[in-house]
């Protein structure tokens, strides 16, 4: 009989713990798919990422804080789950067709105001009810906040593994979101056992099926009047193939990747570099080979090409849609294709190259910026032979170089000069940077002679057009602009060039974008780091003087939220810099933090007593962890270090959440306030770190700021401990 009672109790506890588990699963999976789709439609750089993540955290925090004003019932709890499951597909549909409301063309880049407005509206619809659900779950478990947080963390960890390793690699964003929603709808139905409401989950499932079927047709509507012939979501982005008459164009996250045929681009990316060393044998091409660059390289009879492409799906799409002649090029025995991150390939290869051609987009994101840093350029130089040439190209302007463009080009030029003694820039709508340890020339007569000797039949890199493009006046003008602009060096841990690229991006709009970026780029680090820290110290002094016990329990939660989200962003950027963009490992990094939260909250739940001294120890743990990371980062630590760091950071965060909330709830029964402040702290970190602090002040200075922030928080706790 006792066994039956124990079994019944265990089943009841499991059933009661499932709703917060579903909440964590729902929140993280929907957040991932919303972030991915938002990046497709709003220029997926760190600013986009920062806006949508910050808006998500903001509304989640507000939802949690205001939930106390909403009367709880189990019926409302169930309805809230179904509501969120329905709202996400509707938001994704609205996001896809937002271009019609914004009156923009397909693939056109939008400004900050539409981006900010859209992120706030979308997050309000999904994240606000999720914040309310956290408090509802606490009521459902009769005030057991720790069990809710524990199971929510476990649900998030499970969702991270399922979404990153099973849904994203095999399904589109819409299909993945629908599958995640369908799983939650079915589990919600069986968990709450509302047999009288069979029609509700059935209606939800039918809606999700219709949503899935509408995926590709809705994309065709989005791209009208262009003809969309294929769409494929991969772990690295959304690839879409458009056909206009005889031309095939590939778009990656709604940004133009390449078109075929496009002789101008393919010839320029190759010949200016190879004409400097026409006897080159070993050539490394990083990205962009399927667009025609490989065909141009093979015009040089001795070349053997190592072609590195991150996303294998690009090559598969090329085989499917490019003409047979281009498919034969990809199968040529002189070409070896490697599917991996270009930077990771360069770091690990033992081969030396006569030519390295970087054929990637400009450094508009931290991920791409890794290929334009001092450290990468030094590694490229190390892998080149004595007369080897390194080359890359970025969009520019033919006749007028604006101050914003000048700063961007100057940053790249001076960074390149840190590695190579000889640097030349080819003027034009696209600036081609050439660098070598051997003297270079851009004299028309020399290049023209080599074209004739090699019998090259080019259309754009030809004597007729080179005479105008390599006009000495234009060559000198671009050199003068590049050498006299801001001399900021783009480094792995201080990625300034992608901020300059964002400033340049802002000049495309007529709104406040340019003013905002110009303002922040002119600020000194004092206003970005020191001044906010001084304000925080004054706030702590005021709270200490007031002496309210709740302040000593709640302030560390907001600091923890800020610290952990900034630490996650720093770890991902640093990891990509050292080891390349390795999709599965990045996913595991994020999951390891969630696992740490689960373990930390479990540890907190098992504590026998709770007092302020325990918060002191945990806060001191944050300080030691940040100091350890900052010190170790300079030593190029092994991969496992980053996983352990995020696991430990999550563990401390989970433990602190339980202890501080336990102490706070003794003072006041407000289940959502602590969770809300945690999310609002994360909101501040997400908004500031990815878009401003990391590129402008760099990772080392930001880590120092985190250390100081947590130090003053520790002193605040010490003051509270002594006072009470």
Annotate each language-model stretch with its function.
Residues 1-464, 471-724:
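Alpha-helical transmembrane segments of multi-pass membrane proteins
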């Amino acid at each position: 009989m006792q066994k039956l009672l124990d079994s019944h109790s265990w089943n009841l506890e499991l059933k009661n713990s499932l709703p917060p588990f579903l909440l964590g699963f729902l929140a993280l999976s929907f957040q991932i798919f919303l972030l991915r789709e938002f990046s497709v439609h709003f220029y997926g750089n760190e600013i986009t990422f920062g806006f949508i993540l910050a808006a998500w955290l903001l509304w989640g925090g507000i939802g949690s804080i205001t939930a106390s004003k909403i009367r709880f019932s189990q019926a409302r709890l169930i309805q809230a789950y179904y509501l969120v499951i329905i709202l996400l597909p509707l938001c994704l549909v609205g996001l896809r067709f937002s271009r019609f409301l914004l009156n923009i063309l397909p693939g056109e880049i939008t400004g900050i105001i539409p981006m900010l407005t859209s992120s706030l509206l979308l997050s309000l619809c999904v994240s606000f009810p999720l914040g309310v659900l956290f408090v509802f779950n606490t009521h459902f478990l009769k005030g057991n906040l720790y069990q809710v947080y524990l199971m929510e963390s476990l649900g998030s960890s499970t969702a991270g593994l399922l979404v990153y390793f099973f849904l994203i690699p095999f399904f589109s964003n819409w299909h993945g979101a629908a599958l995640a929603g369908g799983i939650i709808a079915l589990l919600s139905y069986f968990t709450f056992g509302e047999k009288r409401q069979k029609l509700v989950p059935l209606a939800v499932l039918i809606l999700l099926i219709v949503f899935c079927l509408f995926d590709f047709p809705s994309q065709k509507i989005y791209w009208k009047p262009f003809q969309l012939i294929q769409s494929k979501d991969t772990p690295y982005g959304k690839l879409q193939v458009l056909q206009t008459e005889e031309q095939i164009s590939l778009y990656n996250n709604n940004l133009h990747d390449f078109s075929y045929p496009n002789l101008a681009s393919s010839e320029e990316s190759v010949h200016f570099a190879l004409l400097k060393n026409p006897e080159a044998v070993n050539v490394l091409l990083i990205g962009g080979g399927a667009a025609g660059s490989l065909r141009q390289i093979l015009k040089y009879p001795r070349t053997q090409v190592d072609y590195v492409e991150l996303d294998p799906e690009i090559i598969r799409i090329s085989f499917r849609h490019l003409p047979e002649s281009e498919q034969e090029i990809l199968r040529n025995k002189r070409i070896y294709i490697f599917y991996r991150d270009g930077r990771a390939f360069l770091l690990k290869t033992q081969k030396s190259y006569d030519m390295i051609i970087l054929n990637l987009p400009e450094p508009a994101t931290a991920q791409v910026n890794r290929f334009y840093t001092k450290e990468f350029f030094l590694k490229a130089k190390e892998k080149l032979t004595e007369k080897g040439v390194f080359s890359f190209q970025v969009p520019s302007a033919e006749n007028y170089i604006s101050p914003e463009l000048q700063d961007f080009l100057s940053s790249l030029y001076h960074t390149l000069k840190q590695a190579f003694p000889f640097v030349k820039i080819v003027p034009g709508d696209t600036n081609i940077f050439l660098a070598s340890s051997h003297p270079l020339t851009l004299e028309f007569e020399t290049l023209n002679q080599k074209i004739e000797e090699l019998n090259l039949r080019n259309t754009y890199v030809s004597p007729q057009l080179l005479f105008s493009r390599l006009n000495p006046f234009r060559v000198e003008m671009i050199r003068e602009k590049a050498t006299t602009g801001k001399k900021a060096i783009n480094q792995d841990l201080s990625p300034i060039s992608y901020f300059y690229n964002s400033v340049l991006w802002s000049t495309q709009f007529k709104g406040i974008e340019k003013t905002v970026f110009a303002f922040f780029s002119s600020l000194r680090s004092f206003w970005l780091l020191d001044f906010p820290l001084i304000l925080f110290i004054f706030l702590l002094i005021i709270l200490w003087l007031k002496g309210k016990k709740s302040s000593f329990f709640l302030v560390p939660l907001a600091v923890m939220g800020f610290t952990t989200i900034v630490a996650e962003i720093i770890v991902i950027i640093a990891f990509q810099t050292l080891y390349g963009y390795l999709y599965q490992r990045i996913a595991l990094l994020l999951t390891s933090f969630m696992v740490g939260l689960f373990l930390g909250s479990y540890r907190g739940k098992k504590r026998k007593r709770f007092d302020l001294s325990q918060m002191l120890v945990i806060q001191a743990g944050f300080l030691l962890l940040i100091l350890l990371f900052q010190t170790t980062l300079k030593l190029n630590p092994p991969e496992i270090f980053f996983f352990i760091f995020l696991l430990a950071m999550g563990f401390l965060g989970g433990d602190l959440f339980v202890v501080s909330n336990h102490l706070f709830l003794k003072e006041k029964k407000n289940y959502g306030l602590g969770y809300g402040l945690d999310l609002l702290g994360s909101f501040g970190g997400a908004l500031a770190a990815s878009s401003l602090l990391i590129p402008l002040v760099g990772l080392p200075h930001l880590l120092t700021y985190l250390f100081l922030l947590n130090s003053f928080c520790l002193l605040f706790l010490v003051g509270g401990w002594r006072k009470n």
